[in-house]
Amino acid sequence: MSAAAANTPSSSATILPFAEHSKVARDTRPLRLITCGSVDDGKSTLIGRLLWDTKAVKEDQAATLHRDSGKQNDLGLPDFALLLDGLQAEREQGITIDVAYRYFATDRRAFIVADTPGHEQYTRNMATGASTADLAVLLVDARTGILEQTRRHATIAALMGIRQFVLAVNKIDLTNYDKAGFELIAHEFRDFASDLGIKQITAIPMSALKGENVVLSGKASMPWYEGPTLVETLELATVRSTQSGGFRLPVQRVSRPGESFRGYQGTVAGGSVKPGDSVVVLPSGMVANVKQIVTFDLVRNAAVAGDAVTLVLDRQVDVSRGDMIVSIEAQPLTGLAFDAQIVALQPGGIEAGKRYWLKSASRRQRVSVQPVSQLNLREGEWQAHETSLPMNAIGKVRLSFDETAIFDPYEQNRATGSFILIDPDTNNTVAGGMISAKRSTGATEEQGDRVILSLPAGLAEKLLAGELLAKHRDEIDIRRTDAATASRLIGDLD
């Protein structure tokens, strides 16, 4: 987005063309978003205004708002931030500490919004809110512009996989609706965001307190701005799909109500499945076909990401809580060593080399954590750092497991690519993390000392189901291909 051209419809709404607002094939799934930015930029006020103008505030809340606003607001308008600041400490200090989640809806879409703290000491709370969001609304005070904490939050949001950003230049009324100042801020953020790989940016000048360009248009005060309001932009945003990748079912429970029934229960974390599909149980590598998909009251002909189901297989296989049932043709990564990025959440930080409990989906196992580098948020650069990571630090680490771990890269699947670290001494959650890649550890793999076997699919599945190969499932690289390609590959080896 060119900031200088922010007053044109095509450039001010880069998520989707605003000019075709009524014609766009709209994604109607609920949108999860996060508001972030430096302290006192107006995040809570903005969400409060969204709730107020979309009629999401109940009568008793409205009465309380009018009663309490007189204590803190001298502008003649309700203090909309009071709808969000729920902790006593927040109200006394006039800041956000915890992550507050709120729900609102328009005629076109529903929204779940997380209001996150702006103070540096609560960076961990902001990272938590960003981990489930599809879009970030980054607030900037029109008087002060881009600050260090603004860059910090944009960087964290990008690390958490958010690719859609709204740059909300708030309090524009306090600059006498200065167009040049708005364009300068938008241009500065565009340059910074390009280094983070952020391309979908919509810059909007607004006054959250007055409600200009939030839900209702601010054209009366800003005739130079012809782009969308915040709500119009949110209505056109897209939601990350988890149904397009491989099937993933982290097993939460094995159901045995009687001798004749054995089902594997969990919530589908990715892809889809239907009766007759071939699946593999990880980490054992046992292969089976889906016989039936059951919910609490009916038998289904398919299941997709987000569905809580019981899966019945066509043969007896050894499955327990923590295993993952996946599609054969698109399997996750399995191994004993992975690279990851983490956010330290507790005052003690992350100790180098210490063994923690790692929990991902329904699987829990012991892991050793070795920091590699730490993100310098002021400079936006990764710096070598092999000692302990302090609280609020973002670091790259190496994870070493005693038993086979199962992950997808976080970029491909948030549910199976994320994890938490638990201190075994205190049972506190000390870090949240994202898998970036599997790390090679075996000497033979590094030296290329491997044998390629080309087998018919049926025979390969039988071999993998055997006890010997099942024990070495994490060392086997399966690549499915057609007979012609297999013949060509074997010919290339001669």
Curated annotation (Swiss-Prot):
Residues that bind GTP: 37-44, 115-119, 170-173
Keyword Transferase found: yes
Positions of the UniProt region annotated as G5: 207-209
Catalysis performed (reactions): sulfate + ATP + H(+) = adenosine 5'-phosphosulfate + diphosphate
Any GO molecular function: ATP binding
Spans annotated as G4: 170-173
Stored PROSITE patterns: G_TR_1, G_TR_2
The keyword Transferase belongs to this UniProt entry's keyword annotation: yes
One GO term of the biological process aspect: sulfate assimilation
Listed EC numbers: 2.7.7.4
Location of region: G1: 37-44
This protein's UniProt keywords: ATP-binding, GTP-binding, Nucleotide-binding, Nucleotidyltransferase, Transferase
tr-type G domain mapped to chain residues: 28-242
Record-annotated disulphide pairs: none
A Pfam family annotated for this UniProt entry: GTP_EFTU
Segments of this protein annotated with the region G2: 94-98
Region described as G3: 115-118
Enzyme class: transferase
Superkingdom of source: Bacteria
Subunit relationships: Heterodimer composed of CysD, the smaller subunit, and CysN.
UniProt record similarity statement: Belongs to the TRAFAC class translation factor GTPase superfamily. Classic translation factor GTPase family. CysN/NodQ subfamily.
Function: With CysD forms the ATP sulfurylase (ATPS) that catalyzes the adenylation of sulfate producing adenosine 5'-phosphosulfate (APS) and diphosphate, the first enzymatic step in sulfur assimilation pathway. APS synthesis involves the formation of a high-energy phosphoric-sulfuric acid anhydride bond driven by GTP hydrolysis by CysN coupled to ATP hydrolysis by CysD.
Protein's name according to its UniProt entry: Sulfate adenylyltransferase subunit 1
Organism (species): Agrobacterium fabrum (strain C58 / ATCC 33970) (Agrobacterium tumefaciens (strain C58))
